[in-house]
Each structure stands twice: as C-alpha cells, then as structure tokens.
Amino acid sequence: LEALLAFQCMAPRADRPTRRVVLFGNGGGTSVLATDFFARQNLSIDPLADEALEALEALDLPPGTSVVNPIDTPVNTLQAQEGRIAGAILDAVYTTSAPDAIVMHLNLAAFLGRGPIDPMDNLINAAVSVQTKFPGQAHFMLVLRSDGDPDLEESKRTYRARALDAGIPVYDELANAAMALTAIRHVEEHLDNI
C-alpha cells in the first residue's frame, strides 16, 4: 500500500533515481533510527553541503536544533513563528541542496499541551507550499505520527486529507515512507535502463 500511495502522488524520474534523502522533523531518537532504516534501503541521509548548512544556520534556530541531516527540530523550534519556520527551513533546503526526496515527519502528540500555540496548520501549509514553489525538484513525503489518541487521530485525518489534496503522500511511520521511496527508486532505476 505504501508504494501504491507513492505512485499515486509522485511521478518516477528516469533521469535521477532516488537515493539522497533529507529527513526533517521533530524526532530525536526517531530520526536516528530512521537514518539507519533508510540506509538499509539504500537511501542516503548524508550531511548537507556547506551552502545549505549556512542557509539553515542563518535562520538562527533555537538551541537543540540540528541542521546537518537529518534536520532534527524539537517542538520549540517548530513552534517558532507559529510553525512558519518550517517554510523557511524547507525553502533553505530546496534552494541550496539537490536531494532526490524530502521526508517531513511530525509527531503530533509531541505538540499537545506544549506552549500557547498549535503550529500544525502552518507546518502542513509549509509542506503544501513547497509543492507549488519547487515543483518536481524533489519527491516530498509527509509522515504524521501519533499515539492513537482519538482527538489526535481526527486532526491527523484532516492534515492527511490536506496533504493528499496537494499531491503529498502521507504515512504513519518513517519506515513506511522509506519502503515507498525504495519502490519509487526501483522503478526509476528500471526506467533509467530502458
């Protein structure tokens, strides 16, 4: 099912099989585990180039944020500018890097009761916005993780629908996104050999 959703939303590229991936989100340990899993799928989470690092560091992100790749942004970072900081981060990655794919992952439960604002609408807006600002530049996937809380699941359904309407495949876990990207890469490699 992961692969079918990816093919429904993304067109395989014959000229550039997917290998280089940027992970961006609030994960901590999740990002580390995902990096290992992606590597086992032959998807590289390599450090970003100096130009990208400089652009991200120029955003003056709060302490605790790592921008090397994965771009690990704690909740307080993603709450900056009411979540609009995600748009600036994505813009910096798109304008200074050439990843084959970007996977944005958000743990919805981590935002619950953390601060006076809920940045999720603006985080989703940032994901949707890059589809029109940088069309075809990199495959883009969204991972929305939750703990099964009914209210969170309702919000997750709403965010999933918005993303899908913009052509963004949405997964429950990073491993699902990695498997989908692997399927895309296999088709791209086949097309490249035709």
Regions found by a protein language model. Give the residues of each.
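Peripheral docking tails and interdomain loops at the edges
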Residues: L1-D46, D118-I194
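Short glycine-cluster motifs
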Residues: P17-G115
